[in-house]
C-alpha cells in the first residue's frame, strides 16, 4: 500500500468511486407514466495514472439496454410517484453492475446537454419537436412515442468529448482534420489557435464530435481514430 496524500486537517471528506458501468437515461413523463427516449453508455478514460477518469464518450444506444431498461424505468416510475410529476422531462444518470443492480447518481427534470442531437441521429426522435408539441400540440406526443422503439435504432451514434489543460492553444490542425472524417455528423471546436484554455469559462470542452455508424462495431473503429 502506498500513501497518496497527507493532511493535518481535523476532518476529511471521503467519497466512494463507483466502478460500475455508467449510463445516461432520458425520458418523458406523460399522464404520470415514464416513457423512455434513450439510454446511453457514459464512458470515461483515465488520462493520468491514479487520477479519476474523465468523461470522453457517450454512446447510443447502450450495449446493456436490455439489462437495465426495465429496472431503470421502474426506479423513475417510483420516483415520480413520490414527487407527483405528471408530465415533462425526466433524466437519470446511474451505475449498474450485474452483481449490484442499479445505483442512482442523479435524477433531474431536464434533458442532458449535448445529447439531444443523438436521439435524432440514432432514432429520428427530435427533442425539439417534442418540446414544441408540449407547448402547442400535446396530442402529437402520444403519437411520437407510439412510433418510437429504443431497441430499433437506424444508426449507432456517439458524442466524443475532448478536454485539455489550462494552456495556450498552439495548433488546431488535428482538430479540424478529425472534423473531416466521414463518420462526423457535427464537429464543435471551441477554441482558436492562440487562445488560452480557461477552466471555468464559456467553453465546456476543447472540442466535441458527433459521429455515427451503421453498427456498434463500426462505431468502435471510428472512435479509435479520434483517440490514437
Regions found by a protein language model. Name each.
Residues 100-103:
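Conserved protein kinase catalytic/activation segment
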Residues 133-228:
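Peripheral (often C-terminal) accessory segments that flank ATP-dependent C-N-forming ligase machineries
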Residues 5-7, 83-85, 179-187:
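Short secondary-structure junctions
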Residues 16-22, 26-85, 96, 108-135, ...:
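ATP-dependent carboxylate/phosphate-activation module, predominantly the ATP-grasp catalytic core
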Residues 13-15, 91:
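Short catalytic-loop micro-motif centered on adjacent basic/acidic residues
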Residues 86-92:
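Active-site-adjacent "lid" and substrate-binding segments of diverse enzymatic cores
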Residues 1-13:
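N-terminal beta-alpha lobe that positions the nucleotide/phosphoryl donor
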Amino acid at each position: 500500500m502506498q500513501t497518496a496524500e497527507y493532511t493535518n486537517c481535523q476532518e476529511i471528506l471521503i467519497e466512494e468511486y463507483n466502478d460500475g458501468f455508467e449510463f445516461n437515461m432520458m425520458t418523458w413523463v406523460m399522464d404520470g407514466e415514464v416513457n423512455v427516449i434513450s439510454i446511453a453508455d457514459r464512458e470515461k478514460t483515465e488520462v493520468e495514472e491514479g487520477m479519476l477518469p474523465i468523461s470522453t464518450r457517450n454512446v447510443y444506444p447502450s450495449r446493456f439496454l436490455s439489462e437495465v431498461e426495465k429496472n431503470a424505468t421502474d426506479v423513475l416510475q417510483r420516483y415520480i410517484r413520490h414527487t407527483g410529476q405528471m408530465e415533462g422531462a425526466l433524466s437519470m444518470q446511474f451505475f449498474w453492475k450485474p452483481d449490484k443492480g442499479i445505483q442512482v447518481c442523479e435524477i433531474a427534470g431536464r434533458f442532458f446537454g449535448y445529447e439531444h442531437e443523438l436521439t435524432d441521429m440514432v432514432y429520428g426522435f427530435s427533442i425539439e419537436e417534442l418540446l414544441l408539441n408540449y407547448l402547442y400540440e400535446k396530442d402529437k406526443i402520444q403519437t411520437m412515442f407510439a412510433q418510437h422503439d429504443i431497441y430499433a435504432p437506424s444508426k449507432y451514434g456517439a458524442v466524443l468529448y475532448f478536454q485539455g489543460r489550462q494552456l495556450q492553444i498552439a495548433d488546431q490542425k488535428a482538430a479540424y482534420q478529425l472534423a473531416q472524417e466521414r463518420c462526423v455528423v457535427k464537429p464543435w471546436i471551441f477554441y482558436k489557435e492562440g487562445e488560452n484554455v480557461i477552466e471555468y469559462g464559456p467553453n465546456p470542452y476543447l472540442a466535441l464530435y458527433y459521429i455515427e455508424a451503421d453498427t456498434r462495431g463500426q462505431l468502435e473503429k471510428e472512435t479509435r481514430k479520434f483517440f490514437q
